[in-house]
Amino acid sequence: MPRHYQKRLPPGPRSESPAKMTSYRFYQLGCGMVSTDLGHLIGLLGVNGYSVRSDLYFLHWPHFDPVKSSTSPNPSADVVAKHVQGRGDLPDVDVLAHLGDRSIGDCICESGATYARAQDAQRLFYVDWLGVSDEFQGHGWGAYLLRRALTAGRRLSYEHAAIAVEGDNHRALLLYTNYGFRVVGYGYDFCRD
């Protein structure tokens, strides 16, 4: 990213937009979130050489109840859901799709306990990655892989689902909100040049 590049905050009154959060690196910690209503903090970051590197929508689906998995967009494809032991009490889920030797896409989900120690995090199913190869996009694979992963997570006793999506990924945002997720926050990732 060029040194002079800086994203602007969305215009308009705060009440017209989702809750906004700002992500910045704390000393010896990962990322922290702070409301963008704290203008003095954003000002301090800017004065000290920080700029917005990326922005994310945070989505949540409490008590998620996915529609049962439907038929694969291509019945000839090999789709496998694997349970992988992660940091939580419940296993993580990886859903992988291949057609012959070509990768169609994958959906990687983790326990919220991967990122937080709170007991409630044990039952949070976090969709860490959903990707479909370019040649297979537009055929329903993203929705299918997400549905398969969420169905597997629900069977494992996860209660809530969450996902984050880049601010300019409108197709993904539309998919997630149509499927049942709701925007609960908006974050900015600051970096120092």
Specify the residue positions occupied by each region the protein language model found.
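A conserved beta-strand-loop-helix scaffold within acyl/acetyltransferase catalytic domains
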Residues: 87-93, 98-131
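Acyltransferase donor/substrate-recognition loop-hinge adjacent to the catalytic core
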Residues: 41-93
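Conserved GNAT acetyl-CoA-binding A-motif
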Residues: 12-34, 153-164
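Active-site beta-strand termini and strand-to-loop segments that position acidic
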Residues: 61, 98-100, 192
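…primarily DNA-binding HTH/wHTH and HhH modules…
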Residues: 183-193
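Ligand-binding pocket scaffold of soluble enzyme catalytic domains
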Residues: 77-79, 99, 107, 130, ...
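Conserved active-site alpha-helix within GNAT-family acetyltransferase domains
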Residues: 22-54, 143, 167-185
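Conserved acetyl-CoA-binding loop-helix of GNAT-fold acetyltransferases
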Residues: 1-16, 129-132, 138-151, 155, ...
